């Protein structure tokens, strides 16, 4: 626990803004919407194009998987921020999130009214890995959980661990329990001020170390007196697994922060050299469109002039000029989005996100040491 807390505290001196901007891409796996796209890994470029299509410009040729992932990233990000800001969470708040996540399946929306189970046969729970409580108990269990989420009886990491495990144990919905349960981790850490922008990829670590995760949850679900030595040991085992994941997530976030800082330094050098060669002697003003685009690039690696206008309030001509200038210097490249339209993208950011996600999927956090343990995008080609 102390190691995890120290690792998170070290993030306080990092460029948290950058980490917040790219966190939604690292948490891409949490946005997988339904079983028909489970196991498909849309790459960061396709997801960024899908986000662009949602907000600024229609993009042709997008896969349904990329669009679904982009939509659910927006849903989870918005819901987490909303849940983190309310004084008292209610079961209805969690139900609203679940309904938004399974909007394409009205028959699976809301609190379940039938028994469900995890693992084993689809027809009976005899070989299930876990059988959640009966539907008749859900109202009381969910009120108890949201009351706990609204308080501060334990430290943030312990609270996030217990809330996540209890929610996964209750399994209150017909579908979407995993995604809601993972969102609760970020909700707690944000509510308690530990990670103001929900940047820690905790659930990716738990997914990578799935055997430890499942063993920890199983220990937490000890059937017997909760205050017995066995019950306490089970809770402690789960909290240890979770705290270890938080510590690793914070350490990997620091690695990403250092890599982003290196990228920014490279961009600054490329900008200065490009302007020198173009005879632009004066440095751009801090409020110039060029610098504003560079500032937001980690979070918006694919953009159009309309994106720049929406984000930074520049003129359309100023936005177009800034993007063209950055492309001229090799910081951005262009990508077709259909019908003669083009967008600008940062290969550096997209490649970095892919490399980091692959590393997070490796039990050793290094694919040269151990391969990814779940489906991830292909390694980007060498070079810029």
Question: What kind of feature is each model-predicted range?
Answer:
Residues 1-384:
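FIC/Doc superfamily catalytic core
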